Amino acid sequence: MKMTLCNTLPAYPNFVEGIRRAPDRGYTLTPAQTATALKNALRYIPTEFHEQLAPEFMEELRTRGRIYGYRFRPEGDLKAKSIDEYRGKCIEGKAFQVMIDNNLCFDIALYPYELVTYGETGQVCQNWMQYRLIKQYLEELTQDQTLVVESGHPLGLFRSRPDAPRVIITNAMMVGQFDNQHDWHVAMQMGVANYGQMTAGGWMYIGPQGIVHGTFNTLLNAGRMKLGIPQDRDLRGHLFVSSGLGGMSGAQPKAAEIAGAACIVAEVDAYRIETRYEQGWVGHVTDNMGEAYRMAWEAMQQDEPCSVAYHGNVVDLLEYAERENISIELLSDQTSCHAVYEGGYCPAGLTFEERTRLLHESPEKFRSLVDISLRRHFEVIKKLVARGTYFFDYGNSFMKAIYDAGVREISRNGVDEKDGFIWPSYVEDIMGPELFDYGYGPFRWVCLSGKHEDLIKTDRAAMECIDVNRRGQDLDNYNWIRDAEKNRLVVGTQARILYQDALGRMKIALRFNEMVRRGEVGPIMLGRDHHDVSGTDSPFRETSNIKDGSNVMADMAVQCFAGNCARGMSLVALHNGGGVGIGKAINGGFGMVCDGSERVDEILRSAMLWDVMGGVARRSWARNEHAMETSETFNKTHGENYHITMPYVADEKLINKLITEL
């Protein structure tokens, strides 16, 4: 076996007009680092082509801040095809080609030419040389081998065994002393680090649908907890305001409509608004703030769902509401603040085009304007909250960005961020106690045949696996999957998101594998978002409702990754940064190919429970009430093969007495 990128150089590609391009990420390398970066990129290429390609790569580095190797991108749109149309020596090798192409197609990817799937910087891999080599390796991969991918670089095929993972991925796993924005930015430019976000570098993105069920759950539970809405009612007659219509944030208007709310989402990028409108993910578009609020108000009066995209800056939108005494009941933000100085947050007063130009021409001035805008953003939210608005951080590092902009007032202890911030994150208040602590999280699947009828069959099968009488969450999830087809959620290949707990995931997974075995559907890829019960450690989001001090520890995510490796998931991934930024999270995920075999049944019975209950156990040990209840029940029902260590809860009066005597 011999892998080589090319025998002749491919022609330089034609870039399709109108397809979004990533901004200049900034070139800050020293001459010595630049030399290394060029040599790093050229090591993928036979030496006879170096003289021609070295200047080309130098130009990319200087003008884009990265070497992407545009010449090696295949022509056209990389739409995911049916698994049968891919070459490969094992089903997993073909299946992961489906997933990669889906991550990079024009309908899905934020910046397709720069391999960015979503979240401003979340890449499948670093460059097109890596993409081509990964595809070659996947075509050669057998059941006795594992492909190892390190920050986008395919290290090679290594002998393993059929019940081992076929692909193991890590992204941006930087050594602690260098695990910061500055050193990461240098490593990215040098071509040795890839920001995989979550499902971008983990090859498991399914379009904005991937977050829409979680957003739906968050909004519905926020309404129940903060607005007093009964369990059997939705958000009709209530207003939700936020920002962002990107790959993840674009789920907000769709989720709000499904939840019955009136919703206004601000977005500075007209292209993103146009995309979401054409996809049916937002109902109305306006650049007039008064009109946006009027449309929402009229829908509220009629108890009708409504979603409005406001083309403009969210700071202006909120200041208008504060000036005009408009009541906003639920408020959040989903700008990409994990990359706040790299274009993820557009300062008030700048158009999107001015933002892009300033990023290239004067990064320091751009940074200054971001800080000024964040401080304004904080002040207007503070005024709205004082008037009764419920604001929640959507886990995008928004409050951390405000803190970093110099606003110490936002920290809970007034000194640093170690005790959290004055407003809750959605995990801290809603998703943690109401979903994660029970084991509910973003389970998903992809019908690898590409057939819509397979998706309809799996929807029906999943629905039949849910006991609506067990918990309120189960009824919500049942209603979600019942209405999924009607809500037109698919963007890209045929996929579905469905929040489920450990037993629900295992039950559905085994049912799907049985359906494949019987020939009722084609092969199915199972997976989840890294943003899950066990998959991510981040005090700024996923573990923000863990209060025993371990919210800063990453043992859970690493153990989840290692456990999924040991149990034979088809793909396992571990990343740095997630949705909150480098150094702020460790996150992992998996992919599992259902081929109908009994071998897969055995893996599912072990791995699906571990993937969830390891996180529930950790949350239980942190003395989270619902996680303790769930763990105790699990010990009773699965005591033959499992046992979760349960905490003894200290008496508060005893502890308080000792503390007061200090």
Task: Enumerate the predicted regions with their spans.
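N-terminal ligand-binding/catalytic initiation module
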Residues: 1-214, 220, 224-227, 231-232, ...
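Catalytic cofactor-binding cores of redox enzymes
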Residues: 101-113, 186, 192-199, 217, ...
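Catalytic or ion-translocation cores adjacent to nucleophile or general acid/base/metal-coordination motifs
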Residues: 197-220, 224, 231, 236-239, ...
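C-terminal domain-closing interface element
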Residues: 295-324, 328, 626-662
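Core active-site phosphate/anionic-ligand binding loop and the adjoining beta-turn-alpha structural block
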Residues: 290-508
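Short, solvent-exposed amphipathic alpha-helical segments in soluble enzyme
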Residues: 257-259, 322-327, 407-411, 516, ...
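General beta-strand structural signal in soluble alpha/beta enzymes
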Residues: 146-151, 169, 242, 265-266, ...
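Structural alpha-beta junctions
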Residues: 140-145, 260-261, 327-330, 383-390, ...
